[in-house]
Amino acid sequence: MSRILVAAALALAVGSVGTTWAQTQSTAPTTDAGTKLNFPATLGGATFERVVNYAAPPANRADLGSSYFYSTPQKMVITVQVFDGGRRVPPGSTSPVVIGEFTNELDSVGQQIQGSGYTNFQRPAVPSSCTYGSVTFRCITYSAITQANMRVYSKLLLTGYQQHFVKIRIDWGQSPQVQHTSADADAALQAFIPALFR
């Protein structure tokens, strides 16, 4: 995958909670304290890259939890953010709390894409439900064109689990050299998510 594509995917991956590079990071695999979800060195074929703890300085935002970054053998980026948003989160994907947070996430994505110099932001008008293993999420796939004239895609998933939000996003791109599809992303998620919730 070209460096431009990797940079574009990483830009989308870090966008939803601000600049993660300035936060406390670690490359050591870990277990999330609130949900007991385990983030090992390899998960469903994807390789652990790093964890960002937003509760630590300089952010000091415990409500934003932590983000765990993985890369797939196909060079797609999977990000898992576990957070509570400062409230108790009901289980599943259909509660008003989860629906409201999903709407907020989509609004934030739209604003960040506009501010990033990307163009031609596309997303369905209505999100859907996606089930991976035994877990159902609210989900949507969106895309935009980078300044390098490459279309990049993200699939955003959100559910409530153990009184926390679990937000998963997979990012991929299409260029003359790389032709990932939504089927490739779904195959990666079908391996990754059941392993995460095991």
Model feature map: region roles:
Residues 1-4:
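Positively charged n-region of N-terminal signal peptides that target proteins for export
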Residues 111-156:
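Signature of long, low-cysteine stretches enriched in small and polar/charged residues
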Residues 65-104:
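A short acidic-to-branched-hydrophobic micro-motif
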Residues 68-69, 152-161:
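Short, surface-exposed beta-strand/loop micro-motifs that present aromatic residues
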Residues 167-198:
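Surface-exposed amphipathic alpha-helical segments
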Residues 23-74:
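N-terminal "mature-domain start" segment
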Residues 18-22:
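Sec/Tat signal peptide C-region and signal peptidase I cleavage site
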Residues 7-16:
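Bacterial N-terminal signal peptides
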